[in-house]
């Protein structure tokens, strides 16, 4: 059985993050090993949420797994609670990613033109380091703009989105997938780019 490590928060309410990743990955007959980055009372769109940062647990977990010769077919990252966690995740990659381990990065930090509550304007710069290590990076449009220094706007045409994807690819990932792309009224899809082949793929 293949094994995937999912590094992201546990939101006690809100249908997201590890509470979604664990059952979905498990339903695909893949073992999902979880690495909680924080425990939140709700996801960050609820006002007044409370959070317990688990930064000090990430590397001890990684070191213990390594001592047990744990192998991972993939490592997926989602919500990282602080700049420190972006550094810890990169060290997690160094400890546990083998030559065939897929690194899948969702730079979950923003939506609707704004950073999530609790993140300062410098946070995208830290997240770039994680994205640079990815084999596959899957930001939404807001996150892609923040990562590439592109001014956010409400409407985008295909040439502009492709330009953003090219800028994302320059950060280092082998494949970039833009999520939440508006293809029409009430219709969202994805736009992907593989820089090695200079090839785009649309679904929506």
Language-model features, listed with the residues they occupy:
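Short pre-catalytic strand/loop immediately N-terminal to key active-site residues, enriched for Gly-Thr
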Residues: 12-13, 199-204
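Conserved N-terminal subdomain of the carbohydrate kinase-like
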Residues: 1-105, 109-117
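Conserved phosphate/ATP/ADP-binding segment of small-molecule kinases
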Residues: 117-198
């Amino acid at each position: 059985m293949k094994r995937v490590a999912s590094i992201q928060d546990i939101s006690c309410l809100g249908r997201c993050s590890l509470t979604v990743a664990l059952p979905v990955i498990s339903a695909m007959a893949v073992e999902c090993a979880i690495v909680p980055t924080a425990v939140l009372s709700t996801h960050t769109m609820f006002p007044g949420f409370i959070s317990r940062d688990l930064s000090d647990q990430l590397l001890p977990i990684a070191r213990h797994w390594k001592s047990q010769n744990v192998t991972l077919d993939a490592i997926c990252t989602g919500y990282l609670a602080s700049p420190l966690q972006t550094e810890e995740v990169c060290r997690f990659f160094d400890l546990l990613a083998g030559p065939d381990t897929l690194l899948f990065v969702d730079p979950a930090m923003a939506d609707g033109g704004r950073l999530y509550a609790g993140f300062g304007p410098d946070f995208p710069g830290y997240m770039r380091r994680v994205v640079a290590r990815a084999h596959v990076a899957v930001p939404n449009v807001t996150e892609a703009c923040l990562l590439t220094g592109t001014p956010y706007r409400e409407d985008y045409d295909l040439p502009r989105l492709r330009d953003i994807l090219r800028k994302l690819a320059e950060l280092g990932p082998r494949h970039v997938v833009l999520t939440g792309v508006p293809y029409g009224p009430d219709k969202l899809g994805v736009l992907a780019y593989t820089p090695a082949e200079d090839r785009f793929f649309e679904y929506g």
